[in-house]
A protein has these predicted regions:
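Terminal "cap-and-tail" regions of soluble proteins that handle hydrophobic small molecules
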Residues: 1-26, 139-228
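Hydrophobic ligand-binding cavity/cleft-lining segments
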Residues: 2-83
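Histidine (H) residue identity feature
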Residues: 30, 38, 62, 66, ...
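Ordered hydrophobic segments in well-structured contexts
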Residues: 30-34, 124-135, 149-153, 160-166
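Alpha-helix initiation/capping motif
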Residues: 41, 93-95, 188
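Short, low-complexity intrinsically disordered segments
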Residues: 46, 58-59, 133, 157, ...
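Surface-exposed flexible segments
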Residues: 52, 97-104, 178, 182-186
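Glycine-rich portal/gate segments that line the openings of hydrophobic small-molecule binding cavities
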Residues: 66-143
Length: 228
């Protein structure tokens, strides 16, 4: 994928890379994962991030890979602007300490593409942000974490919602003079399949309890459909 065309992620037509990984010419590692979230909606998905999962809930999300969860620079009522401070593994690999700084969609997508996707029901949730490769990840003059980019885009369907997850690891490194060879050494090829498997597993696992949890926490505003 041309990394300057993020708007294409909001188009439900099949992408060249829906599930897999590739090394871009500048060395950035692109991982794509598609996950079917049965009985879930984009509203539920966005709420999960806005609720800022605790360590206990974070472990529910992925019982083998997730270790700890904390939140920094919290903004009430939204995940945007907050930083998720986590420790996790990718498919059982050595644990990593990471920062995820959630951002507004219009920082990465054009306003027209967002509006078109919403009007045409091509998207029901957009979760996006910047990733840091350590808890001491550097920031630029605007306070933005320097490192990677991540996108989770939901589209509601008759059976639930489909999730597109795309990661661009090392996104900021070329701009500070790192060569493609440098990026290969810093972010090895083995990271791609490990992150792909991790992503598919964590969101499949999330889909199995998110509907009940969402309704339990929002029963004053959403109907509860009893199974009997």
């Amino acid at each position: 994928m041309d990394m300057n065309k993020f708007d294409r992620l909001l188009d439900p037509a099949p992408l060249t890379l829906e599930m897999g990984y590739e090394r871009l010419e500048n060395g950035v590692l692109h991982i794509a994962c598609r996950t079917d979230l049965h009985a879930c909606t984009g509203e539920m998905f966005e709420w999960w991030f806005r609720s800022r999962p605790s360590t206990q809930q974070y472990i529910w999300w992925h019982p083998t890979d997730h270790i700890s969860s904390d939140w920094l620079e919290v903004h009430d009522g939204t995940h945007i602007g907050s930083i998720h401070k986590v420790e996790e593994r990718f498919s059982g690999s050595e644990s990593k300490q990471l920062l995820i700084q959630f951002a507004k969609p219009d920082e990465f997508f054009s306003e027209s593409a967002i509006a078109n996707a919403i009007v045409n029901q091509h998207t029901s949730a957009i979760i996006c942000g910047r990733g840091g490769e350590s808890w001491q990840a550097p920031r630029n003059s605007l306070g933005q974490i320097m490192g990677s980019r991540l996108f989770h885009i939901c589209r509601d369907t008759d059976w639930g919602c489909v999730l597109r997850s795309h990661f661009f690891l090392g996104w900021d490194l070329p701009s500070i003079g790192k060569s493609p060879h440098d990026l290969r050494n810093m972010i090895g090829d083995q990271v791609a399949p490990a992150l792909l498997g991790h992503c598919y597993n964590e969101f499949t696992l999330l889909s199995r309890f998110l509907p009940s949890l969402f309704i339990a926490e929002n029963r004053e505003t959403h109907p509860v459909h009893l199974p009997w």
